[in-house]
């Protein structure tokens, strides 16, 4: 599994989007190529330089549950485009 983070700040949080209810949703990618592609789309939308890190599925999901954070796992079959910047954050 892979997360998108700010380059140089990998220990300070990963990319998340905010849903219509104000909940943060952590984006988790099954494939590294998909995470890299998403990071590139973010950078094209004037985000700072991004980095992709590998994480163990059970560790990141457990961290989400402990911190009461929602998450979404994207498969290679999913088409993912960044939402508007005001709907994003790093958690």
Regions found by a protein language model. Name each.
Residues 1-91:
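Conserved NAD+-utilizing ADP-ribose enzyme module
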